[in-house]
Amino acid sequence: MATLIYVDKENEEPGILVATKDGLKLGSGPSIKALDGRSQVSISCFGKTFDAPTSLPKATRKALGTVNRATEKSVKTNGPLKQKQPSFSAKKMTEKTVKAKNSVPASDDGYPEIEKLFPFNPLGFESFDLPEEHQIAHLPLSEVPLMILDEERELEKLFQLGPPSPLKMPSPPWKSNLLQSPLSILLTLDVELPPVCSDIDI
């Protein structure tokens, strides 16, 4: 870490040298440069370098001091004006809110027909039963394969069959021919491959 320290002659101690601990450990001595009647001490070290802010001459300090004082005075003069403005705008805001309250229609009178459009019964969403005409509780559905039915007539035929038995099982009305016998499916998947050449040495 390198630090730059300026020593003013006004402080009556121009010979002060400040070194960091790293600089003392490394054995690097500080170097002094003279700039405009001031002595500058710079210490070089390894790692990140940070520069201390340079001190300004008295003339610039006075100039900045007067600028700062001028801005403080302007802030003080603007302060009371800002306090008066909110009170003026508060009157306008109260007038606007009164006008808005008069212009907004009452919520009770507006749109009563919308509430009647959608009747809502929360108990209706808790029942998971099918209607009586579509009850399937009397059918033994264990181990029944998925069937895709074409029309309502086939559905009626299925209900007229009664409980299924392994001895009297009619052919189900399948919609597609995807569930064919395994041999027919394997025959469609057969692909002719080129003959194997046994003459080629591997």
From Swiss-Prot:
One Pfam match: Securin
Region described as Disordered: spans on this chain: 69-106
Coiled coil residues, start to end: none
Keyword field contains Cytoplasm: yes
Keyword Ion transport: no
Tissue-level expression: Expressed in ovarian tumor and tumor cell lines (SK-OV-3 and PA1).
One GO MF term attached to the UniProt entry: SH3 domain binding
Domain-related comment: The N-terminal destruction box (D-box) acts as a recognition signal for degradation via the ubiquitin-proteasome pathway.
Transmembrane segments annotated in the record for this chain: none
Residue ranges annotated as motif D-box: 61-64
Homology family: Belongs to the securin family.
Superkingdom field: Eukaryota
The name this protein goes by in its record: Putative pituitary tumor-transforming gene 3 protein
Subcellular locations according to the entry: Cytoplasm; Nucleus
Alphabetical UniProt keywords: Cytoplasm, Nucleus, Proto-oncogene, SH3-binding
One record GO biological process: homologous chromosome segregation
Sequence motif SH3-binding, residues: 163-173
CC terms in the record's Gene Ontology section: cytoplasm; nucleus
